[in-house]
Amino acid sequence: MLKNSHIYIIWLFGFISGFNVMITGNTLNYWFAKKDIALQTIGMLSFITLPYSINFLLAPVFDTVQIKYLNKILGHRLSWICLTSTTLISLIFILSFLDPSTDLVLLSFIAFIISFFSAAQDTILSALRTKIVPKESLGFTSGIYILGYRVGMLLASSGAIYLSIYLTFNAIYKIFAGVIFVYLILLILVARYTNSFDVMEENTSYSYVARCYAIADMNLKNKFFIKNYFNYFKNFISAYLLKIFSGFYFHRNDINLAYYIILILIFLVLYRLPDNLINVMINPFLLHLGYNAFEIASVCKFCGVMGAIIGGLIGGIIMKYKNILYSILLFGIIHALSHIFFILLEINGKNSLILFITIGVESITGGMTMTAYIAFISSLCQGKFRATQYSLLSSMMGISRSIFPIISGYMVVNFGWQNFFLFTTIITIPSLLILLKIKTKIN
């Protein structure tokens, strides 16, 4: 049975996840752009969010390892949340004394570590959320979680950029540390009313990893050292992927499973790539056009989030009448065309009306594509390994966000803003062609 305390906890989970992702994401990106850090450098620093791409690898650790002393006081899950939160508070407080102009390398390194612990905390919260919420309440609590997530994002992005009119970012990051401290205290107080935090159970998805190591170790003796370990890694990955994706539903049983898994992974990376390239460069672009902090905070961040929510609702309604593959193809085409508005904005210069239309159209269509994207991933996951399947597939979105945008700054410097946005429109085509290739094979 779903308790009121569970609702508060789920909202807090969503809030802190959305809040943390902005601390080392868009808000830090804006700070870099405001400090006139080179576009090439800003693009390269997208790697800071890389830990979010591999957080599924951390899950077995948090499921099995106990923190000796904290575990006795707070329980297994809450002790991990406490440890990651206090670490985040300390790191963010240290970061608040640095300046991107003079301490860029150290600041970026600390931001990367912050992302690591934020991603780790997300993994813990996701596992805990599935344990304390009854299956019949998953839909309702997902809405509560998303609401908290959006509120956290707004405060840490739009709110922070608006505050930068009156405060330095050093002061704002000290406030960030304070918010996480208050969150931790609230979570501990609310958690005292439920025993759900102490639940531990075996995860069959992760128990299979050990068996994959055994498979990988077969027939690798008496080989050259480097080749031996290369083959070990290759065999482990093959055994792991083929097993966890063996539940995928395909129309034919004789198709090459590994081939289509690779195509699906490539599609998931490329489909989100245009948005991720733009997200890294959007703050420098708007500052380049002459927009101030208030305009960016209100139109681009606040209205952008509202547009994404509206787009998500529209996408959900359309998918009630159209299948997922049709929707993700249609939404992808519409969203790609929306990027043309950025070219119009660059041609016309600072224009509030065009900016509002551009952000509105891009955000709404982006919300539609994201809804179809998540639904597509969810529809692929079958069998007892569906949790691991979902974690791995959704991590492709993180890879697209953290690795490939490294080149975005170089693209702008060498080819200009108009060609950059034209590229983000065209790059959608390969992902849609891959979708057409695989859609005949997937149920």
From Swiss-Prot:
GO terms for cellular component: plasma membrane. One of its GO terms (molecular function) is transmembrane transporter activity. The chain crosses the membrane at residues 5-25, 42-62, 78-98, 104-124, 143-163, 171-191, 230-250, 254-274, 299-319, 324-344, 354-374, 393-413, 415-435. Keywords: Cell inner membrane, Cell membrane, Membrane, Transmembrane, Transmembrane helix, Transport. InterPro entries: AmpG_permease/AT-1, MFS, MFS_dom, MFS_trans_sf. It is a multi-pass membrane protein. It is found in: Cell inner membrane. Pfam families: MFS_1 (PF07690). Its main location: membrane. It comes from the Bacteria. Belongs to the major facilitator superfamily. This is Putative transporter AmpG 1.
